[in-house]
């Protein structure tokens, strides 16, 4: 009598979890469109927004200037605005671990934590400028190991074109040949810098920023000269 061996059942692929980090100072329509397009394209049930507390490239504490000399908005205000911006979309959630984490916040640390929590199919959403800067981040090659990199096209870049590979020096050289996946989305030339400048100059930002966020900015006198 022979015993027939059966192959073990294949392990199910974990559901993708999309991540969108940033200072969100303030959150705007571009963030929301980017997140929704990425969620649908990669089949993610949820996009977690990761507001930065003390980013590597920027100070995250009130009173300390960022690299461009501007005073960053307090994390409590940025978190409150983000909650208002995401309200009403059950597929959007906030993960505030980088605000709660003491000291500088690094993307690779967040990805490692999420993997340890069982989220092994991660989609990291980046802008094209962030991708170009990625080789200067902490352990860039490890970031590519932990997550699929989904890149938002620049407003003038056709969505059909292939995004560039990350390049750099040192450890960043190791990510030079790695490819990324581009997010198919409409071109939107909106940035938090633009929103802050318009508010500071008394220009309208309606339809660029959710109404609830506009009300919060006005109530708390944010971005005024």
Describe these PLM feature segments.
Residues 1-164, 168, 172-225:
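Nucleotidyltransferase catalytic core that binds NTPs
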């Amino acid at each position: 009598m022979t015993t027939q061996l059966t192959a073990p059942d294949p392990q199910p692929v974990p559901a993708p979890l999309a991540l969108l980090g940033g200072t969100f100072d303030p959150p705007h329509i571009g963030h929301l469109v980017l997140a929704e397009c990425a969620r649908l394209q990669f089949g993610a049930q949820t996009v977690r927004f990761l507001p930065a507390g003390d980013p590597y490239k920027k100070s995250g504490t009130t009173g300390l200037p960022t690299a461009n000399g501007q005073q960053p908005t307090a994390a409590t205000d940025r978190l409150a605005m983000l909650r208002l911006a995401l309200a009403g979309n059950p597929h959007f959630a906030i993960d505030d671990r980088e605000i709660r984490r003491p000291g500088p916040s690094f993307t690779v640390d967040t990805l490692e934590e999420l993997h340890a929590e069982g989220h092994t199919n991660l989609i990291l959403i980046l802008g094209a400028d962030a991708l170009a800067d990625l080789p200067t981040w902490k352990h860039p090659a490890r970031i590519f190991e932990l997550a699929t990199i989904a890149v938002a096209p620049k407003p003038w870049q056709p969505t059909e074109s292939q995004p560039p590979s990350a390049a750099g020096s040192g450890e960043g050289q190791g990510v030079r040949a790695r490819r990324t996946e581009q997010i198919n989305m409409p071109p939107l030339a909106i940035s938090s810098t633009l929103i802050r400048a318009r508010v500071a100059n008394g220009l309208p930002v309606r339809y660029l920023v959710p109404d609830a966020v506009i009300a919060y900015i006005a109530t708390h006198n944010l971005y005024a000269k």
